[in-house]
Amino acid sequence: MNITKAELVISAVKPEQYPDSGRPEVALAGRSNVGKSSFINKMINRKNLARTSSKPGKTQTLNFYLINDSFYFVDVPGYGFARVSKQERQKWGKMMETYFTTRETLKAALLLVDLRHPPTKDDVMMYEFFKHYEIPVIVIATKADKVPRGKQQKHAKIARETLRLAAGDSLILFSSETGQGKEEAWAALLPFLTE
């Protein structure tokens, strides 16, 4: 995929702020600090369009990135150990649920999990949520460069088993450092962007 243009269009907190262009959208979900911003930057060959942070829970809005004027990456708030109040977390949860269950232009979701560790309960719940609402899901196992090559498949197998990955759902090993998995991720995404 040749990316010629990428821009952050809006950081939205409520549905009336979502773009209404009708372009297809792919949501990125995952724990705080799993590497969603780094994933976006690597996929579109930019250093810092999506701002990365060492402080978990930085993304508190739905960030709509318009790519090539043709589709959106939507970065949703990270779940897990974001340092916010329970009330804030519930507010985010509601915002995410509203987006995932009512957004007609949402074509697929990318669930990012950390390849170094088995998926968390939150990861499993998120995967089951997507399956329940029949949102096509592609699992991206990030930080693959931190796992020795010889052990990557073993870690991938643990991830598949923990998530109880459905037949036909992809799990792609990805590294924003080396670019491993980038072509594969685009290949998995393209069918949803060209419907």
UniProtKB/Swiss-Prot annotation:
Q: Name one GO biological process term.
A: division septum assembly
Example GO CC term: the record gives:
cytosol
Cysteines engaged in disulfide bonds, as pairs: none
Residue ranges annotated for the EngB-type G domain, each copy included: 22-195
**UniProt KW Magnesium keyword:** yes
Keyword annotations of the record: Cell cycle, Cell division, GTP-binding, Magnesium, Metal-binding, Nucleotide-binding, Septation
Among the GO molecular function terms of this UniProt record, one is:
metal ion binding
- NCBIfam families named among the record's database cross-references: GTPase_YsxC (TIGR03598)
Primary role? Necessary for normal cell division and for the maintenance of normal septation.
> Could you identify this protein by its name?
Probable GTP-binding protein EngB
- Species this protein is from: Geobacillus thermodenitrificans (strain NG80-2)
Q: Identify the gene encoding this protein.
A: engB
